[in-house]
Amino acid sequence: MSSHRQSPGRRYYPALLDLEGKRCVVVGGGEVAERKVQSLLECGAQVVVIAPQATQAIGDLARQGRIGLSVKSYTRGDLGGALLVIAAATPDVNARVAADAKRDRVLVNAVDDPEHCDFIVPAVARRGPVLIAISSHGASPALSRRLRQLIEGCVGPEYGDLAELMGRLRPEVIAIGDEDERRRIWEAILDSRALELLRDGRRDEAELEARRCISSARD
């Protein structure tokens, strides 16, 4: 765990976490907490919210059985069994959550308070299975969001479609024993008209184009 002291040279280790079925706690019930809850649910996390008051959307999720909701103030011990906690309450509460998380060896993100964070959440652009994360190491979330917007303008949904197509072809290509040959096939697909065809919505033709690349590389 980190010492929770932000230094000018601090650098975070980029990683993607598998949160499927993992207990994740969100302390706070406002709009920021609501967004954090939604993003955790998208990753399959088992979400528990702890807050004396919560937005209607959080309440609705609890009534639907999609999250756990403890309508109370945060207390020591609320992090039991959690992989991570997001502190999205008041600064005082967030500081207590961060201190408890450090003692309990639970990863903590305190909203707008990088000094108390073990991890920060990047701005994300998604295109199907493609995920592009942008971070300023907490220096300027606004800059990260602007960069995300620029990337989203350049990387269209066809890139997600191409990733899905290549994922379907992956077992067939992986079965080819030679590593250099596999690399040539992937490069040939990327250099082919497959992306252009997907951009035009011509999915079947794109797959045929990709399969031609496989056949040509093996001839």
Please name every model-derived segment:
Residues M1-A62:
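Hydrophobic, well-ordered beta-alpha structural blocks that scaffold small-molecule cofactor pockets
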Residues E31-V32, D92, G138:
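Residue-level detector of alpha-helix initiation sites
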Residues V47, L69, L107-V108:
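Hydrophobic beta-strand scaffold residues
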Residues A51, L69-S73, D112:
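Short loop/edge segments at beta-strand edges and connector loops
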Residues A62-G80:
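Glycine-rich, highly charged phosphate/nucleotide-binding loops
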Residues L84-T90, N94-V121:
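ADP-ribose/adenylate-binding Rossmann-like module
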Residues A110-G160:
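E1/E1-like adenylate-forming module used to activate ubiquitin-like modifiers
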Residues G138-D219:
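An accessory alpha-helical subdomain
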